[in-house]
Amino acid sequence: MILSEDFVRKYDKRIINIHPSLIPSFCGDGFYGLHVHEAALKRGVKITGATTHFVNEITDGGEIIMQKAVEIKEGDTPEDLQKRVMEEAEWKILPLSVEKVSNDMISKR
């Protein structure tokens, strides 16, 4: 666990994380940075992507907000894949997720 249970409970559904895979694949303890992309390439999956989710007491275990798929190309290195996932997925869905969560919070007031 990265943040304490008390902290994530206090800010329930107000902390967003972005993870460089399509959760539930390649997530949880030990899956961060290039490790995620190395695991996807080693497994031989054809599609990966990024997921935004709310943070809870389980690493990468919170409610999913948004996902975007990215194709894995023949000859990809972990670094190639990391760059493509950031550019094609992470950088697109993070601002959209923040906007969605903000709008949902405002509409519930």
Language-model segments: which ranges?
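Donor/substrate-binding cores of folate-linked one-carbon enzymes
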Residues: 1-107
